[in-house]
C-alpha cells in the first residue's frame, strides 16, 4: 500500500477506478499493476450494503413458516397452552402474509390483527411472544404498561416503545416495521371506575387513548440514535401499521366478571336453576369464555378492545405442567443449570422427587413457571459458591430434601489424578 508517495521509478500513482492521483486521496492501495483509493473502497462497500438490503426482503418472503410449523416450534419451548398456541400461530402467519402482499389481496384491504393474551402470572405469555420473534427472526421489544403515561406527564411516552424497537435493530426503520412489540401488564391500565372522573386518569384510560393510534397504525416520529428531541433534529418516520402488537396481562378478577355474566341466566325465585359448588367453572374455563363486554366492564375502553381483535387465553399451569417445564423444553431450567455445572467439569443430576418438590413449591407460591428459577437458584446457591474452589467433584445430586432445605446436595468425588495415574 502506498500513502501519497511515488513508486520506485518516481512516477506519480493514480487510482485505476476514479483516476485521482495519490495526492488527492488519503490512501492508495496497490495491487499487481493496479491501484484503488480509499474513496473507491468506501463506494464499493456502500454498493454491496445496498444490494444486501435489497436481497434480504426476498429471503424473508420465502421463509414464512406455516401455522403448523409455528405451532411445532412453540411446542419445543412452551409447555401446554395448546389453544393459545394455535390462535397465535394463525394470527402471526396472517399478519406476515398481509405484509408480504402489501396489505391488499385482489383489491381487498387486509385488516391488522393485533393480539391480546389473557392468563395468570407465569403461564407463558411473555415466553410465547419471545419465541415467536426468535422463530421469525424479527426485532422484538417488551414494554411495561405500568410505566406509560400520556404525553406531557411524568413517565414514559408511548412513542418510547417504538424507540426501543429501533434500538434492537440499530435504527433500521425497515427492519423495525416488521418487528413484534409485547406490552406487558396491559390490565394495569384499566379505567379506574366506570364513571368519568373530574381528574385525568393519565396512567389508565389516558394511556389506552395514547396507545390506540400506535397499535392501529400511524406514522410515529422517533428521534434518531442517541438524540434528544430538539427542533433541528430530523425524526425517523416509522409506520406502526406493519408492527405486530401483542398485549398481555393477568386480568385478576376478570373471571368473576365473566361468571356474573354467564350465571345471570340462572334467574332467581322458584324457577331458578340452583348450581352446586362443584358445578362452578374453573378460572381457566371462565377466561376462555371472555367477551368484549367483559373486558369493558373490567376497565378497558371499547376502542382499545377493538384494536385487539385476536384474544387468546392461557390456563394456570398445573403441577404436572411445571414438572414438564423443568425438564422437557429445549432450554428447560434443569438443562440450563446442567450446562452451567458442565462448564466446571461437573455433572448435575435432579432426581424426580426433587422436580416434584420444586413444582409443589411453585404451586404454593402461586407464581407459575416464573417462580421455578428462584427455587432452583436458592437450592443450588451454596454449591455454586463453593464448587469453583473444590477439587475432584464429579457429580452433584439434588433430591427432595435439598429443595425442602433439610440437607445439602450430595457431592460425588472422583479419584485424584495423581492417585489414578499411580494405579
Swiss-Prot record:
Domain annotation ClpX-type ZB: ranges: 2-56
CDD domains: RecA-like_ClpX
Disulphide linkage map: none
Pfam family, one: AAA_2
One BP term from GO: cell division
UniProt: ATP binding residues: 120-127
GO molecular function: ATP binding; ATP hydrolysis activity; ATP-dependent protein folding chaperone; protein dimerization activity; unfolded protein binding; zinc ion binding
Highest rank taxon of the organism: Bacteria
Chain residues that bind Zn(2+): 15, 18, 37, 40
Protein keywords: ATP-binding, Chaperone, Metal-binding, Nucleotide-binding, Zinc
GO CC annotation terms, alphabetical: HslUV protease complex
Role this protein plays: ATP-dependent specificity component of the Clp protease. It directs the protease to specific substrates. Can perform chaperone functions in the absence of ClpP.
NCBIfam families, sorted: clpX, PRK05342.1
Assembly mode: Component of the ClpX-ClpP complex. Forms a hexameric ring that, in the presence of ATP, binds to fourteen ClpP subunits assembled into a disk-like structure with a central cavity, resembling the structure of eukaryotic proteasomes.
Family that this chain belongs to: Belongs to the ClpX chaperone family.
Stored HAMAP family: ClpX
Name of protein: ATP-dependent Clp protease ATP-binding subunit ClpX
Protein's organism: Salmonella typhimurium (strain LT2 / SGSC1412 / ATCC 700720)
Gene it is expressed from: clpX
Amino acid at each position: 500500500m502506498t500513502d501519497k508517495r511515488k513508486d520506485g521509478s518516481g512516477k506519480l500513482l493514480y487510482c485505476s477506478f476514479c483516476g485521482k492521483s495519490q495526492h488527492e486521496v488519503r490512501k492508495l492501495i496497490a495491487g499487481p499493476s493496479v491501484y484503488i483509493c480509499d474513496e473507491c473502497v468506501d463506494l464499493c462497500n456502500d454498493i454491496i450494503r445496498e444490494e444486501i438490503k435489497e436481497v434480504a426482503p426476498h429471503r424473508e418472503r420465502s421463509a414464512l413458516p406455516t401455522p403448523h410449523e409455528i405451532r411445532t416450534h412453540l411446542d419445543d419451548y412452551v409447555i401446554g397452552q395448546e389453544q393459545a398456541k394455535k390462535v397465535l400461530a394463525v394470527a402471526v402467519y396472517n399478519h406476515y402474509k398481509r405484509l408480504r402482499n402489501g396489505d391488499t389481496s385482489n383489491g381487498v384491504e387486509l385488516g391488522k390483527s393485533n393480539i391480546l393474551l389473557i392468563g395468570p402470572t407465569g403461564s407463558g405469555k411473555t415466553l410465547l411472544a419471545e419465541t415467536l420473534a426468535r422463530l421469525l427472526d424479527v426485532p422484538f421489544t417488551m414494554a411495561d404498561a405500568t410505566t406509560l403515561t400520556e404525553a406531557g406527564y411524568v413517565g414514559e411516552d408511548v412513542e418510547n416503545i417504538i424507540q426501543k424497537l429501533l434500538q434492537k435493530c440499530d435504527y433500521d426503520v425497515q427492519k423495525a416495521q416488521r418487528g413484534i412489540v409485547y406490552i406487558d401488564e396491559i390490565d394495569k391500565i384499566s379505567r379506574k371506575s366506570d364513571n368519568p372522573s373530574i381528574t385525568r386518569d393519565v396512567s389508565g384510560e389516558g394511556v389506552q387513548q395514547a396507545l390506540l393510534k400506535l397499535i392501529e397504525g400511524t406514522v410515529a416520529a422517533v428521534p434518531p440514535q442517541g438524540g434528544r428531541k430538539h427542533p433541528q433534529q430530523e425524526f425517523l418516520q416509522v409506520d406502526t401499521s406493519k408492527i405486530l402488537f401483542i398485549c398481555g396481562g393477568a386480568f385478576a378478577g376478570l373471571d368473576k366478571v365473566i361468571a356474573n355474566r354467564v350465571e345471570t341466566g340462572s334467574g332467581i325465585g322458584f324457577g331458578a336453576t340452583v348450581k352446586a359448588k362443584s358445578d362452578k367453572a374453573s378460572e381457566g374455563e371462565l377466561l376462555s369464555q371472555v367477551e368484549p363486554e367483559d373486558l369493558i366492564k373490567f376497565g378497558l375502553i371499547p376502542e382499545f378492545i377493538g384494536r385487539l381483535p385476536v384474544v387468546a387465553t392461557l390456563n394456570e399451569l398445573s403441577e404436572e405442567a411445571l414438572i414438564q417445564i423443568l425438564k422437557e423444553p429445549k432450554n428447560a431450567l434443569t438443562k440450563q443449570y446442567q450446562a452451567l455445572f458442565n462448564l466446571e467439569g461437573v455433572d448435575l443430576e435432579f432426581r424426580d422427587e426433587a422436580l416434584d418438590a420444586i413444582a409443589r413449591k411453585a404451586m404454593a407460591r402461586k407464581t407459575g413457571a416464573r417462580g421455578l428459577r428462584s427455587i432452583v437458584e436458592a437450592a443450588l446457591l451454596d454449591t455454586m459458591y463453593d464448587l469453583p474452589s473444590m477439587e475432584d467433584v464429579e457429580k452433584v445430586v439434588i433430591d427432595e430434601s435439598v429443595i425442602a432445605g433439610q440437607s445439602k446436595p450430595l457431592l460425588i468425588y472422583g479419584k485424584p489424578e495423581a492417585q489414578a495415574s499411580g494405579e
